[in-house]
Amino acid sequence: MPVSALSIVNRTKTSKSRKGLVSKSSKTTLESGFQEVLEPSFFDRRADSVARELLGCWLIVQRANQHQEKHRIFEAEAYLGPHDLACHGHMGPTRRNRTMFGPAGYWYVYLCYGMHWMLNVVTGREGLPAAVLLRGVGATEGPGRLTKMLGVTKQYDGKRLEPISGLWIERGDGVPRRQIQRTPRIGVSYAKHWADKPLRYLVNPSIFDSRTVIRSGL
């Protein structure tokens, strides 16, 4: 996939994190080159392992102008399956959650509170509902803000994570375990003893170069 090599930084913006994690620097740069696209086998594992290892990876979105934006993942939550009372699939399949019961490596997108789209990737064995919710990428914190920034809606639900779908994940540099924080998931107080499980994984995004990287298209 030949692309032209460009390298410019054109703007800087600082925003305050709602959780006080960091004041993030948002820059834009143009570059060439592709990293390794994560295959379904990467996701065909326990959701907590996948969530942890997604930190530092790149979420890529194909824009209408054929440019591709790369955003570094810094926060994700794991939902482990039918025994996890915070998991959408613990009561069985429905029209809304049926994507969770499919094969690993597919997007699961649903509407929360009637207004915010949530972006998840299906993990684990087909037939057992498990997924990882993406909560923070680049300079954007919060799953609703994330999908709004990316332009993600229901059209991605059930699509495989691959360039042809317009939304995929590429391998990053990895994050040392000592830099990863674990906390209970957000907004799952209804899930009894599962509400306190430390299945939210995050790193301070200041450890990354938080630029939004733009590549020319295919």
Each predicted region: which residue ranges?
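Conserved, well-structured core segments that form or line functional sites
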Residues: P2-L218
